[in-house]
Amino acid sequence: MRRPKKYEAGEATQYISRRAAIRKLQLSLNDFRRLCILKGVYPREPKHRRRAQKGSSEIKILYHTKDIRFLLHESIVWTLRDYKIFAKKTSRDRAIKDFRNLKRRLALFPEIKLDHIVKERYPTFIDALKDLDDCLTLLFLFSTFPSLHLIPREQSNLCRRLTIEFLHYVIASKSLRKVFISIKGYYFQAEIKGQKVTWIMPHYYPFKPQSRQEVDFKVMSIFVEFYTILQGFTNFRLFHGLNLAYPPQFPSSLLQDNEDTFKDEASFVSDRIAALNFELLRTDKVQEDEEEPDIDMELLEQDGDSKRIIKMKQEAQEVSRLRTLFKGLKFFINREVPREPLVILIRSFGGKVSWDASVFPGATFAENDETITHQIVDRPSLSTQYISRDYIQPQWLFDCVNQRQLLPTNDYFLGETLPPHLSPFVDSKRDSYIPPEEKALHDPSLIETHEQSEEESEEDEAEKEEEEADQELLDAQLQLAYQQETAEYKKYGGPDGVNEDEEDLSEEDDEEDDDEEDVDKEDVDEQTKRKQQEKEKMSVQSGKVHKVNKRQVHKAEVDEHRLQARMVKPRHRNLFRKLIREKQTKEKEEWLLRKKRRNIDADNKEAKKAAKREARKQAAEAAARAAKLVK
């Protein structure tokens, strides 16, 4: 038997460098990158890099050999090779100015078909929904881009169309569950076929060109090329699941014969679709106002009353209430407020919404409509206001959805300081720092309290001294009033302030009290004798207070931790150190957040005190002015 040579078996044969893979596939670097992105092949990190690189110690980009073999049988490879041939022939035709032949070749441009790759990477529809987060986030981002060198206008328009179609499905199915506003954009989470799909809709900012070193638009554009095909298949399946016509269409009642429709019906329909404010055409001709919940409540009632079943019942009831949260409410969006995120939010939960017709087409009612219940405003004041509606800031909608109930609007009025906007995507039972507002939201009894510092204790003592001084002043006033009253009583009564008849009655009462006191003394003597007899039988020893030495407890904890560190196996020591480091950083972050919160609370407390002092000062000045006027 021949002995195998070094690096002919094992880890050395499992990996291949990028240069060798390009040479094997006979592609350029850009084509190889494009092929890997479309097929979902990515670099791998070997366990022993030196063995995988056949003794070489330099850092190389490695791929699995089986992945490269998998790419060899892909039909796209031939299309990418055809691109090279096409480019050479078209450049030759341009050079010799053979425009007739050039026109014929441009008509035969080789196109890459990605349908089979989508089916290959996502065998089931649920697999496609699980991978929809990055797809939607990137499509929403590209839908806001202008026409660039590496991003054609057709691609941005396609991204815009696909995202609008998906939003129409979310509104029709009422599958939105969580929302959040951050500096990155608007976070949305929908529940589709039991899968949670989360995406980000960016804020509307002017486009700022980025350098190639920061953002590689070419690579991102390749991802978008694949994601548009995936999203198109997904939208088609989702629309047909709700019996909606695809591509989206409107009922004939909406397309009235007017000047706009006569000019250009296609642009009229596309504008109304982008408005997200109209119901779409259904194929079954039956429009259901409320979709049935995914959970069968009768089946849950037949099962036992286990904790899991009870939790599922409660969740199903909350979701059914959430789907009609804004039902019966009418909203009007001011022109300074972002329209699209709020329209998605309101219509997904059963509300009606409109805006100024000059901002975007598709407005259904004007601002002077008396049936409007809420107007969403993001400015300090308004010149004209209606009594019949509430003027609120946009955060009210997001907080209502996250808490699954209609919150009071007084904290969200114009000019009010908004309450903290809590994220619904964090775990309420996490080990890290939890703000007091979030604790109070889940359980009011768990509001955070912290130990008082020296400054806080001094402030509390000062407050107590002020209260004592006020109380002493009040007592002195009461004493003075009592003395005046007794003086008047002495003037009109007996010499000591008591009448003669009252003196006789008081003497009789004193005699009765003396008799009662003698009887009480006899009872007390008997009780003391009994207690002495009981004490003789029992023996009680004096106890000692056990004082806990915090320093010794801390030392014991440190010693125990060191013992645990010594008992860790050598191969697990790096992992143990990493875990300890992560724990320390978490504790430090939590401590910093608590300290920051204490400082904020102290500043707020000081501001309230200053406001109270100012109010007292103004009240005293007003009282002094009033006294002068009376004189």
Curated annotation (Swiss-Prot):
Pfam families reported for this sequence: BRCT_2, Pescadillo_N
Extent of Low complexity compositional bias: 620-631
One of the protein's GO biological processes: maturation of 5.8S rRNA from tricistronic rRNA transcript (SSU-rRNA, 5.8S rRNA, LSU-rRNA)
Name of the featured protein: Pescadillo homolog
Keywords: Coiled coil, Nucleus, Phosphoprotein, Ribosome biogenesis, rRNA processing
Organism field: Drosophila pseudoobscura pseudoobscura
Sequence ranges of Basic residues compositional bias: 544-553
Top-rank taxon: Eukaryota
The keyword Nucleus is annotated on this UniProt entry: yes
SMART domains linked to this entry: BRCT (SM00292)
Keyword Coiled coil applies: yes
Region (Disordered): 428-471, 489-561, 602-631
Compartments where found: Nucleus, Nucleolus; Nucleus, Nucleoplasm
Span of domain BRCT: 321-414
Feature: compositional bias, Basic and acidic residues: 428-442, 526-538, 602-619
Compositional bias (Acidic residues): 453-471, 498-525
Subcellular location, principal: nucleus
Modified residues (Phosphoserine): S453, S457
Job of this protein: Required for maturation of ribosomal RNAs and formation of the large ribosomal subunit.
Residues in coiled coil: 591-631
Gene3D superfamilies associated with the record: BRCT domain (3.40.50.10190)
GO molecular function, one term: RNA binding
UniProt family annotation: Belongs to the pescadillo family.
